[in-house]
């Protein structure tokens, strides 16, 4: 009774004798091999990537301490599973994974990219604190934990519209959810957003 109905098949699948994991990817760092995998549940917000570690590419592997290392359960577009980890030309580590939408199809997804790295204990991590906000990409070495330069200003702010279709109200334009949206009831519709104070706006 504690679980939402849509989560029950996922939990049952995890505790059967035939669970499934997919999306293997391996990186080598400081003599260790990091075997990454996608946890079950691409259609859920908790879709994530885990990692095993070994001194040999053929194992034996040990489950890392900080699993899942790629996990983004909320925000505009949740989910962070079935991905790859790679260095750019400046020596920065990045992790890409798929993020859930599941509106037009159960497995409808998009690709997200986040800063990643290895901590002092050799644990692979992925910084998803502001996981779906813009992140600057430069041609220099950067701190994987630095905050984004741009912040979300519109979340749940006051909004008006010329009209709307039922179920597509103006408030859905600022609810930080990729699966909902405002839709005008006419061809020449408009939307007005009040940020309630003056801001330096960089993107709409």
Regions found by a protein language model. Name each.
Residues 135-198:
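Disordered, acidic Ser/Thr/Pro-rich linker "stalks" and the adjacent N-terminal cap
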Residues 44-51, 104-113:
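Structural motif
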Residues 1-3, 52-60, 117-124:
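Short loop/turn segments immediately following beta-strands, especially the blade-tip
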Residues 27-29, 86-88, 119:
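Structural WD40 beta-propeller signal
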């Amino acid at each position: 009774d504690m679980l939402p109905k849509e989560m029950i098949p996922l939990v049952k699948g995890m505790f059967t004798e035939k669970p499934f994991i997919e999306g293997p990817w391996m990186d080598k760092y400081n003599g260790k091999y990091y075997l990454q995998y996608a946890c079950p549940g691409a259609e859920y917000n908790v879709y994530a990537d885990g990692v095993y570690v070994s001194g040999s590419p053929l194992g034996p592997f040990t489950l890392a301490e900080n699993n899942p290392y790629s996990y983004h359960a909320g925000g505009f577009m949740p989910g962070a599973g079935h991905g790859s980890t790679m260095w750019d030309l400046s020596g920065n580590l990045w992790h890409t994974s798929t993020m859930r939408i599941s509106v037009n199809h159960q497995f409808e997804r998009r690709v997200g990219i986040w800063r990643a790295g290895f901590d002092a204990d050799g644990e692979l991590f992925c910084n998803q604190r502001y996981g779906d906000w813009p992140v600057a990409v430069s041609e220099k070495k950067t701190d994987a934990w630095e905050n984004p330069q741009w912040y979300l200003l519109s979340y749940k702010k006051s909004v008006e519209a010329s009209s709307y279709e039922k179920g597509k109200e103006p408030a859905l334009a600022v609810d930080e959810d990729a699966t909902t949206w405002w839709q005008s009831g006419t061809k020449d519709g408009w939307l007005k957003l009040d940020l309630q104070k003056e801001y330096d706006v960089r993107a709409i």
